[in-house]
């Protein structure tokens, strides 16, 4: 498996393009004014496996990370926010959540709970802390 996060994001995005998905939210990464980053993704393909959630991350001055899912009317959107030093985190967390949703979808049962998302976030954060600079997960 290719561990380059940008290559993974490109491949996943290509797999989602169906004539409709890309005209809606698709995937976007933009800067927030507080300042920080936000990754937004249309994850409606996984609607049956997600629940609405409220922001569940933590904020501590300039070191923060937040994430939540909005699911309604057969649409689902994932939002991952972080301070300016968290762009890499956002991308790897997104990949971890999508990989978990793929697993649930393939098994045909289960729900991605807030606790499971927190586990993914914590796991990614720990792996990034343990990864030497200049290398990838």
Tell where the protein language model's regions lie, with residue ranges.
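Short beta-strand-centered aromatic/proline hotspots
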Residues: 121
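Eukaryotic proteins' extreme N-terminal regulatory segments
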Residues: 1-19
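Amphipathic, interaction-prone secondary-structure segments
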Residues: 14-58
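Helix-rich interaction surfaces within compact, conserved domain-sized segments
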Residues: 62-107
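Basic/aromatic-rich interaction segments and small domains that mediate binding to polyanionic partners
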Residues: 127-137
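Hydrophobic residues embedded in beta-strands of well-ordered beta-sheets
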Residues: 37-39, 74-76, 126-129
């Amino acid at each position: 498996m290719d561990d380059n996060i940008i290559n993974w994001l490109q491949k996943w995005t290509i797999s989602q393009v169906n004539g409709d998905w890309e005209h809606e939210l698709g995937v976007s990464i933009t800067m927030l004014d507080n300042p920080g980053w936000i990754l937004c993704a249309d994850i409606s393909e996984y609607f049956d496996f997600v629940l609405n959630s409220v922001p569940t991350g933590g904020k501590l001055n300039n070191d923060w990370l937040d994430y939540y899912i909005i699911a309604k009317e057969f649409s689902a959107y994932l939002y991952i926010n972080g301070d300016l030093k968290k762009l890499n985190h956002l991308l790897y967390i997104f990949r971890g959540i999508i990989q978990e949703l793929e697993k649930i979808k393939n098994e045909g049962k289960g729900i991605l709970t807030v606790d499971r998302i927190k586990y993914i976030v914590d796991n990614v954060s720990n792996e990034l802390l343990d990864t030497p600079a200049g290398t990838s997960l």
